[in-house]
């Protein structure tokens, strides 16, 4: 089981503000910050998604599980409003499996951030 992940960002403050807004609909909040160097987000009390000031040498793809399709849509809307770029609007992705519902947004550094729900739509 993965405990946490870290992602390099070129502009730390800009990325903190982006992730505070983009991840809020998923229940994530800024839990820990180290003076302009690193910040940890997650569902309290434990951060599991970290960003750190550094060179962005390659882009990563991170998927965060959502509790339902509405939460996926809320993530997408919040991330776009926070300055993210569309990389796949909310929708079913049957090539993964019949209930895979995800949305993809690139952050200010081009990292592909996804919210995903694996549950069938119940109406």
Q: Where does each model-flagged region fall?
A:
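N-terminal beta-strand motif that seeds the catalytic metal site of vicinal oxygen chelate
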Residues: 1-16, 62, 119-123
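Long, continuous compositionally biased terminal/linker segments
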Residues: 39-81
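Short beta->alpha transition motifs characteristic of CBS
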Residues: 97-98, 104, 115-122
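Glycine-rich acetyl-CoA-binding "A-motif" of GNAT/NAT acetyltransferases
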Residues: 112
């Amino acid at each position: 089981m993965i405990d946490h992940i870290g992602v390099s960002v070129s502009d730390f403050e800009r990325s903190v503000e982006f992730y505070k807004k983009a991840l809020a609909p998923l229940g994530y909040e800024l839990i820990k910050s180290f003076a302009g160097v690193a910040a940890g987000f997650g569902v309290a009390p434990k951060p599991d998604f970290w960003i750190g000031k550094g060179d962005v040498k390659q882009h990563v793809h991170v998927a965060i599980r959502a509790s339902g399709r509405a939460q996926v849509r809320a993530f997408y809307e919040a991330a776009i409003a926070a300055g993210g770029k569309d990389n796949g609007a909310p929708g079913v992705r049957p090539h993964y499996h019949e209930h895979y519902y995800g949305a993809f947004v690139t952050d200010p550094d081009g990292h592909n951030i996804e919210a995903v729900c694996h549950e069938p739509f119940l109406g």
